[in-house]
Amino acid sequence: MGELFRSEEMTLAQLFLQSEAAYCCVSELGELGKVQFRDLNPDVNVFQRKFVNEVRRCEEMDRKLRFVEKEIRKANIPIMDTGENPEVPFPRDMIDLEANFEKIENELKEINTNQEALKRNFLELTELKFILRKTQQFFDEMADPDLLGESSSLLEPSEMGRGTPLRLGFVAGVINRERIPTFERMLWRVCRGNVFLRQAEIENPLEDPVTGDYVHKSVFIIFFQGDQLKNRVKKICEGFRASLYPCPETPQERKEMASGVNTRIDDLQMVLNQMEDHRQRVLQAAAKNIRVWFIKVRKMKAIYHTLNLCNIDVTQKCLIAEVWCPVTDLDSIQFALRRGTEHSGSTVPSILNRMQTNQTPPTYNKTNKFTYGFQNIVDAYGIGTYREINPAPYTIITFPFLFAVMFGDFGHGILMTLFAVWMVLRESRILSQKNENEMFSTVFSGRYIILLMGVFSMYTGLIYNDCFSKSLNIFGSSWSVRPMFTYNWTEETLRGNPVLQLNPALPGVFGGPYPFGIDPIWNIATNKLTFLNSFKMKMSVILGIIHMLFGVSLSLFNHIYFKKPLNIYFGFIPEIIFMTSLFGYLVILIFYKWTAYDAHTSENAPSLLIHFINMFLFSYPESGYSMLYSGQKGIQCFLVVVALLCVPWMLLFKPLVLRRQYLRRKHLGTLNFGGIRVGNGPTEEDAEIIQHDQLSTHSEDADEPTEDEVFDFGATMVHQAIHTIEYCLGCISNTASYLRLWALSLAHAQLSEVLWTMVIHIGLSVKSLAGGLVLFFFFTAFATLTVAILLIMEGLSAFLHALRLHWVEFQNKFYSGTGFKFLPFSFEHIREGKFGE
């Protein structure tokens, strides 16, 4: 087994970095992305570590850059992305970066403050302009004598009788348009109908100086009499956030004020345009460099975070770090350290020292853009234990194949393949666009999985001879109706029977198996489902048992690699015998029945289901029960007995052997380590030798207790009993679980057929001149439903079922998945623009 089928061999290494070279060395390691730093200060608060001030400075620069980026995006200026990977700035360059970012931030804040003040002034002048314009119209309408009847309620009866001249007060302002109805009701109720409100909409929306949004507003003027009503009206206007403006009473004064307002608006507009041009120039200059600035700052921040994980020796001249790294990359790591030392100008080289440890290393599986998606499928179940068999290489084939068994349709497979090919061909452009849509990003990351699923679906679709629920007659059917008339069919037979069955036993009726896949004649046969159900059910059982046997076989390589002979003798061997004795025999029976019975003898073929049930019951009736082959009873009884013997073999032998080994070690008076004889009471020096020897030869079989460990026979028996029961029952339930291959395939085929019959078939049946137009609409509905239901919904369903078959039925035979992932210190996410990670 090469490295492709296992995780990379990892080692724990210790780094000794000179203080002046540590920054550059960590920078080079980040560019390499092959080491995972361990935190050597787990008990130290993050705010008490050595480089916390540098981290804060980087965070402050990052905050300023986020502010600039927000302003750039608000101005709809594209951020330039040349794909450049800038080098990490030296620590001394941080001051220049801080000064530059401070200057840009202050300049933008000053521009924004001035612009907001000018826009607020511009808004007030614009509102005043509309007030002067609209109020003039209101006063012109007030001169109309018909208005007197509407406003007469404002006059007291005594005043009307005296004939004194009427003098009404008024206020004018602007309010948001959606508040007008509520505003009007409030005025009416509070003032008890003693005010007169006129309002008119402002045609163009006005820009809010704070948010930048455009708001629809209306001009209003309120007439009232008396100071008490005036105070009430002003309080209501204040509550509704209406802007009140002074409005002259005479037309001449209003005209003069309007002229002055228009002049000020023109001047203000000119100043705003100049300020906006200046702001655009500043933001465009920043947009050219902001991506590079982000990468530089966040690389520096990542380096200082990593340096905070290191220890500092007592001389304050050296930083000590511990890292996990792949053994195969040690040379490149050494080269990166030398390069970092040279860049820093240090004369003292950095040292990398491999360490011996009994800690479990992280799991690191190398992937590329093709295998990445399949490895994620495996890791979603659980990160593999260090150096155990990696299921991902086998999943590359088995996953899309089992998906295709459930999804098998040549037409749907073509559509899925074309979609995947489109994503593969345009992957560079799509990656450069950095699409933030989570759903599309998930689909795009699995583009090679979708590609293989589509290709395998085309293959299984040809096997099923199913293309949009119709068969492809490529080689011509092997069945012929003509010979039936030679024997016993007549015209009366055709007229008297709506359905007739062909007899393949008659010469010439059946010409042999179809060259590839299923004969197209079955598509129009009334007993199509009977035939296909039998075929797909048996196929599901065969594929499932082969898949599970393959999983059990892979466990052997794990036991051999980890040197666990007990697991081979009392685990793998009885497991493989148990499964092959029962379910492997079932597969043999299926193939035997297919080959032993032909068209002439098929009516005498016994039921495999009945035979398999009777095999467990040891029931073999003498009458009305035909055997498949001679000696069947003896062989089946032998296989069942062997399978039953495998149960105590798995259950008892391993705990008993472990107990015997423990007792033998316990009763030994002395142990010999490398020629040094140690008695029952070892000295301190000898004890250290023992401890070091036990550490270096750490037990590769976790089930075998060492001398110092207490062996709990009861716990071991319970654990082994659970494993045995789980495996034996799992063989039955997992085999039944693979029948989902048959069920999903049947459901997909039937949905496809219903869609064809209920939609496209109706469109094709229209024979009038409008048939083409009708077919266009029916085909549109057919295409939409095909993509939505059969490709997306059914595809997702088949995907989830294939996922379950791999996680539960396949991987639980050999894959423990109890490891933890190798997370190297890398600048890759920063380079790709995934700053949050």
Curated annotation (Swiss-Prot):
Topological category with respect to the lipid bilayer: Multi-pass membrane protein
Subunit structure: V-ATPase is a heteromultimeric enzyme made up of two complexes: the ATP-hydrolytic V1 complex and the proton translocation V0 complex. The V1 complex consists of three catalytic AB heterodimers that form a heterohexamer, three peripheral stalks each consisting of EG heterodimers, one central rotor including subunits D and F, and the regulatory subunits C and H. The proton translocation complex V0 consists of the proton transport subunit a, a ring of proteolipid subunits c9c'', rotary subunit d, subunits e and f, and the accessory subunits ATP6AP1/Ac45 and ATP6AP2/PRR. Interacts with SPAAR.
Major location (coarse): membrane
Phosphotyrosine PTM sites in chain numbering: Y364
Name the record gives this protein: V-type proton ATPase 116 kDa subunit a 1
Sequence similarity: Belongs to the V-ATPase 116 kDa subunit family.
Organism: Pongo abelii
InterPro entries, A to Z: V-ATPase_116kDa_su, V-type_ATPase_116kDa_su_euka
Keywords tagged on the record: Cytoplasmic vesicle, Hydrogen ion transport, Ion transport, Membrane, Phosphoprotein, Synapse, Transmembrane, Transmembrane helix, Transport
Modified positions (Phosphothreonine) in chain numbering: T250, T360
Residues exposed to the Vacuolar side: 408-409, 472-534, 594-638, 750-770
Top-rank taxon: Eukaryota
PANTHER family: V-TYPE PROTON ATPASE 116 KDA SUBUNIT A 1, VACUOLAR PROTON ATPASES
GO biological process, one term: vacuolar acidification
Pfam families reported in the protein's UniProt record: V_ATPase_I
Cytoplasmic side: 1-388, 427-441, 555-572, 659-724, 810-837
Keyword Phosphoprotein in annotation: yes
Job of this protein: Subunit of the V0 complex of vacuolar(H+)-ATPase (V-ATPase), a multisubunit enzyme composed of a peripheral complex (V1) that hydrolyzes ATP and a membrane integral complex (V0) that translocates protons. V-ATPase is responsible for the acidification of various organelles, such as lysosomes, endosomes, the trans-Golgi network, and secretory granules, including synaptic vesicles. In certain cell types, can be exported to the plasma membrane, where it is involved in the acidification of the extracellular environment. Required for assembly and activity of the vacuolar ATPase.
